Amino acid sequence: MSSLPLPEQPPAAERPRLSLSMIVRDEAERIEAALASVAGFVDEMVVLDTGSSDDTVAIAERCGAVVASMPWPGDFAPARNRALELVRGDWVLVLDADERLRPEARAPLLELIARPELLVITLLREEEGALQSPYSSVSRLFRRHPALRWSRPYHAMVDD
């Protein structure tokens, strides 16, 4: 955990509302750190559980997330779209339970979501332990809009 002070956030009334959307299954070992990485940054945390048999749901609720559930639909797109239906923010940040938002990313992201001309923001993801390049671009921050939906069964994207 970094000891750097977090940048001050403008009051929620002065900026777009930001929601976290996450789908999970049996992520009890990882979900707390993922949710902690966005706590105080997002205005709501929505977790869609797809059939956990461990303490994932209880941990997410303890961290302040709104938790819903559905049976695993067979691919990621329908699950991500269902989670997207549950969020209420103007912008949606999508994380997996094994991902973290770095504290130094908060201020620049707040500046970007305040820009009315932007619809989708591509983030740089660093994968620890990757055998090939540890970096990849992912479209995981976007304005909530009825036309934006997930479309692939794996490595689902909203910008296809």
Model regions and ranges:
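Catalytic-site signature of metal-activated, phosphate-bearing donor transferases
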Residues: 2-9, 17, 77-84, 90, ...
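Acidic helix N-cap motif at the loop->helix transition within catalytic regions
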Residues: 29-32, 54-63, 104
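A short acidic, amphipathic alpha-helical/loop segment
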Residues: 33-34, 59, 82, 108
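A conserved acidic beta->alpha catalytic loop
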Residues: 37, 41, 49-61, 72
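Conserved donor nucleotide-binding strand/loop of the catalytic core
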Residues: 57-82, 86
